[in-house]
């Protein structure tokens, strides 16, 4: 049983649908992160006897600007149709939204299982406004946020700072920016399961109000990360000393766009290459990778000598040339007792050639190399 299912079983049956919808549909904020529920309790007197679960209050964790907000949601299991109360825990204690702006709380619909999700969305809208007000006392932070307003990403920016005395900055302030970049060209084969929405978000952590130290970090959705690599493999530009987000965000966007273009071009060139070989050797194709187009195997015959040609396309194709592995159908290697093979990594090749030209040149090389391969293969141990 998952932790979410365990939590739901503890809730009053009439409250459970609200929490179930939160766990299933509660994706909020720039990163579209899932909400999490824990610490289910009951507000009923301890002597009350019930035959059903009576949990009616719980903590909810909301991803926001690289942090996690912790709020407490309080229903009344004796009157489960009433709207819940909220307690904003930790650094959120001073958050005091105007109840008149929380339409889904003031007009609570107990029959709608999405009512709690809608109420949380209202609260998050007011919380974002609250955070914008907090940074107004810090000129550098206000400048950074204001400078993003004219960019495409202005509607997808979260800023988070905790409660601080006026004019002080005791802990980092986070800017979380969803980068407005088209990720749809990334090939679908990279992640087979449903990985959710494709996105790339930039977290910029300001360690002080002057911005003298800023730490950037890039977060990618599963398919995008699988294609481009994680943070250890994908080195985004450093945040320059004295720089600002208005200049830095476009640099990261350009960097990502180049990586995506490289991935897409490589995929298209591999597909073109494999298609050219299938066109020339259609009847000889043993198998090929129809998703990522990284492998191709052919069964070939020359003067009644049969062999298998395995072709592997490297990740940096076409910059790096494919590897040809000739495998005998008759003879075993003297060293390991396996089918004799000859690996060829050097032959006429240019990354500027089309797939058709590569297949044509490869065919000429294969015909030229077969006699040599047959001679060495025959000289090995026979079956």
From Swiss-Prot:
Assigned keywords, A-Z: Apoptosis, Cell cycle, Cell division, Chromatin regulator, Cytoplasm, DNA damage, DNA repair, Mitosis, Nucleus, Repeat, Ubl conjugation pathway
Localisation per UniProt entry: Cytoplasm; Nucleus
CDD domains: BRE
Region of interest (UEV-like 1), residue spans: 31-150
GO cellular component: BRCA1-A complex; BRISC complex; cytoplasm; nucleus
BP GO annotations: apoptotic process; cell division; chromatin organization; double-strand break repair; mitotic G2 DNA damage checkpoint signaling; positive regulation of DNA repair; response to ionizing radiation
Record remark on domains: Contains 2 ubiquitin-conjugating enzyme family-like (UEV-like) regions. These regions lack the critical Cys residues required for ubiquitination but retain the ability to bind ubiquitin.
PANTHER family: BRISC AND BRCA1-A COMPLEX MEMBER 2
Self-association state and partner proteins as the record states: Component of the ARISC complex, at least composed of UIMC1/RAP80, ABRAXAS1, BRCC3/BRCC36, BABAM2 and BABAM1/NBA1. Component of the BRCA1-A complex, at least composed of BRCA1, BARD1, UIMC1/RAP80, ABRAXAS1, BRCC3/BRCC36, BABAM2 and BABAM1/NBA1. In the BRCA1-A complex, interacts directly with ABRAXAS1, BRCC3/BRCC36 and BABAM1/NBA1. Binds polyubiquitin. Component of the BRISC complex, at least composed of ABRAXAS2, BRCC3/BRCC36, BABAM2 and BABAM1/NBA1.
Protein name: BRISC and BRCA1-A complex member 2
Protein's organism: Branchiostoma floridae
Lineage: Eukaryota, Metazoa, Chordata, Cephalochordata, Leptocardii
């Amino acid at each position: 049983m998952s932790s979410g299912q365990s939590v739901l079983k503890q809730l009053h049956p009439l409250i459970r649908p609200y929490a179930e919808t939160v766990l299933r549909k509660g994706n909020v904020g720039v990163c579209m992160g899932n909400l999490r529920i824990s610490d289910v309790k009951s507000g009923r007197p301890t002597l009350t006897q019930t035959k059903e679960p009576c949990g009616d209050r719980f903590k909810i964790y909301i991803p926001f600007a690289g942090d996690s907000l912790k709020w407490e949601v309080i229903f009344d299991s004796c009157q489960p149709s009433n709207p819940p109360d909220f307690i904003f825990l930790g650094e959120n204690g001073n958050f005091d939204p105007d109840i008149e702006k929380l339409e889904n709380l003031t007009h609570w619909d107990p029959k709608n299982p999405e009512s709690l999700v809608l109420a949380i969305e209202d609260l998050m809208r007011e919380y974002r406004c609250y955070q914008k007000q907090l940074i107004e006392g810090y000129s550098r932070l206000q400048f950074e946020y204001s400078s993003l307003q004219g960019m495409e990403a202005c509607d997808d920016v979260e800023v988070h700072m905790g409660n601080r005395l006026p004019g002080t900055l005791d802990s980092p302030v986070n800017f979380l920016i969803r980068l407005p970049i088209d990720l749809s060209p990334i090939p679908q084969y990279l992640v087979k399961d449903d990985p959710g929405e494709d996105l790339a978000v930039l977290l910029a952590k300001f360690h002080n109000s002057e911005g003298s130290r800023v730490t950037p970090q890039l977060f990618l959705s599963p398919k995008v990360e699988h294609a481009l690599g994680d943070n250890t493999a994908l080195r985004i530009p450093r945040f320059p000393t004295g720089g600002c987000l208005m200049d830095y965000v476009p640099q990261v966007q350009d960097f990502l766009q180049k990586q995506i273009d490289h991935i897409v071009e490589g995929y298209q060139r591999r597909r073109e290459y494999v298609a050219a070989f299938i066109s020339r050797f259609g009847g000889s194709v043993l198998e090929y990778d129809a998703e990522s187009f990284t492998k191709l195997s052919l069964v070939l015959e020359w003067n009644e000598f049969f062999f298998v040609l395995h072709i592997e396309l490297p990740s940096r194709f076409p910059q790096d040339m494919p590897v040809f592995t000739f495998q005998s159908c008759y003879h075993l290697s003297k060293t390991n007792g396996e089918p004799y093979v000859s690996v060829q990594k050097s032959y006429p090749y240019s990354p500027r050639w089309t797939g058709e030209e590569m297949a044509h040149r490869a065919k000429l090389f294969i015909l030229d190399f077969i006699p040599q391969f047959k001679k060495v293969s025959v000289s090995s141990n026979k079956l």
